[in-house]
């Protein structure tokens, strides 16, 4: 054992082992902290650079000091580019669907007919796409959104102008009066106030037909009712007959003989209703009725024809093409606006119309609401 004053034996490598008050770094005395063994380093216990004292990386960085995946400026730019391309692609597809609406398949749920019925409303997508393009600050998306806008204006821009003009020598009105109408007398007064030469009424019951006959007798001394449809006229009627378009009578024809002009063949029609259900847009009976009506029109020899009624479909619906391809819409040629007629509380589609052949529409419009769920439609024509 060494005494306190003796030196330690040399180490095997020749380096003396410091002890007590020997040479070299002195041993800590009492509570004095040991000195760092590297000159200029951080104080003892300081965390490495990039690590917080608690051992957690600062917000927004990884332990290595970089941004988390997907939050870097490069990642955000990449996602924005993808969003812009998706938006531009959606706009182009939307424009193509609008432009090629007649080519959308009608198999299964009759998607094509439903799309064509609601076609005017497709323009509502354009402002939404423009807002998204502005949020993304994308010139590509903004330019792409112009495509559906141009297509919609091409299809319906003319309807936004007032094409009504003066002239005309025959005014006609058509109205689905609604079998459940609680005020047929009030409805008759609204119709009489329009001052038309000819009225065509659809969805008549035996009881309501009697009310209309009574209320309209003073202004319209000539009338005929067959099944659920009827024609009231200021001028004599001739050649009155039913038109068989369905198993039950929902169409008729009469010749209106006005003294100041040539006779006109007038049809009052009510095609079968359509249904939107889990089975899709069911239109079979209506389509059959349209084909039967088209056959009757093919055999019609009168040079001047007016078809008034509830077609339960829009003029552009391909299923009505057998009829509409032979006639012209007074609303499309001489109306103001889109002329929606149903439902009366918030008209969203035009399923009631005035179609003509051999006559010139001068003006077309809708009348004020009655007790029916349809709005009446009117047109002034030149023979």
Each model region followed by its residue ranges:
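Soluble catalytic domains of enzymes that build or remodel membrane lipids, polysaccharides, and related
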Residues: 172, 178-192, 203-383
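N-terminal, active-site-proximal structural segment of metallo-dependent hydrolase catalytic domains
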Residues: 2-32, 39, 58, 63, ...
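Short Gly/Ser/Thr- and charged-rich N-terminal loops/segments
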Residues: 42
């Amino acid at each position: 054992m060494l005494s306190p004053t003796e030196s330690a034996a040399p180490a095997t490598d020749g380096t003396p082992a410091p002890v007590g008050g020997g040479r070299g770094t002195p041993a800590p005395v009492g509570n004095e902290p040991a000195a760092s063994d590297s000159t200029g380093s951080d104080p003892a216990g300081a965390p490495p650079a990039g690590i917080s004292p608690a051992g957690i990386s600062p917000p927004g960085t990884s332990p290595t000091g970089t941004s988390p995946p997907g939050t870097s400026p490069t990642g955000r730019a990449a996602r924005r580019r993808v969003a812009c391309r998706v938006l531009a692609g959606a706009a182009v597809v939307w424009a193509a669907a609008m432009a090629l609406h007649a080519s959308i398949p009608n198999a299964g749920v009759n998607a094509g007919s439903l799309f064509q019925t609601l076609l005017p409303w497709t323009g509502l997508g354009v402002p939404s796409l423009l807002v998204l393009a502005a949020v993304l600050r994308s010139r590509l998306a903004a330019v792409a959104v112009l495509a559906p806008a141009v297509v919609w204006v091409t299809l319906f821009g003319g309807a936004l102008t007032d094409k009504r003009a003066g002239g005309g020598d025959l005014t006609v009105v058509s109205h689905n009066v609604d079998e459940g109408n609680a005020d047929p007398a009030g409805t008759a007064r609204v119709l009489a106030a329009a001052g038309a030469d000819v009225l065509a009424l659809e969805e008549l019951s035996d009881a309501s037909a009697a009310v209309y006959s009574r209320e309209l007798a003073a202004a319209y001394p000539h009338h005929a009712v067959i099944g659920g449809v009827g024609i009231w006229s200021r001028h004599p009627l001739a050649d009155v007959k039913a038109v068989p378009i369905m198993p039950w009578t929902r169409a008729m024809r009469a010749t209106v003989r006005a003294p100041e002009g040539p006779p006109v063949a007038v049809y009052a029609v009510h095609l079968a209703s359509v249904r939107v259900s889990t089975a899709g847009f069911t239109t079979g009976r209506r389509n059959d009725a349209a084909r039967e009506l088209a056959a009757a029109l093919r055999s019609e020899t009168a040079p001047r024809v007016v078809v008034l009624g509830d077609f339960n479909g829009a003029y552009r619906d391909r299923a009505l093409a057998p009829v509409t391809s032979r006639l012209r819409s007074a609303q499309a040629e001489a109306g103001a606006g889109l002329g929606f007629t149903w439902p009366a509380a918030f008209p969203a589609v035009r399923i009631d119309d005035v179609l003509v052949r051999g006559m010139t529409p001068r003006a077309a419009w809708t009348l004020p609401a009655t007790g029916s769920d349809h709005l009446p439609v009117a047109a002034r024509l030149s023979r």
